[in-house]
Amino acid sequence: MTQLLLFLVALLVLGHVPSGRSEFKRCWKGQGACRTYCTRQETYMHLCPDASLCCLSYALKPPPVPKHEYE
């Protein structure tokens, strides 16, 4: 009986699977990821609500706004 109880407890403990993307919060319209550090292929855009960095791939980074030169 104790082996059956131990087996059921082990199944309950090992059967709990956390959600896969719970750590990776999204930002920048779902294209960026909130992280502590950005990878080499990413750039920092702004801060996420939890004060982590919003990392966006260089391929998805919007082009810079051109500056008007006054002559």
Swiss-Prot record:
GO terms for biological process: defense response to bacterium; innate immune response. PANTHER family: BETA-DEFENSIN 124. It comes from the Eukaryota. It is found in: Secreted. Its main location: secreted. Belongs to the beta-defensin family. Gene3D superfamilies: Antimicrobial Peptide, Beta-defensin 2, Chain A. This is Beta-defensin 124. Disulfide bonds join C27-C54, C34-C48, C38-C55. It comes from Pan troglodytes. Keywords: Antibiotic, Antimicrobial, Defensin, Disulfide bond, Secreted, Signal. Residues 1-22 form the signal peptide. Has antibacterial activity. Coiled coil: none annotated. GO terms for cellular component: extracellular region.
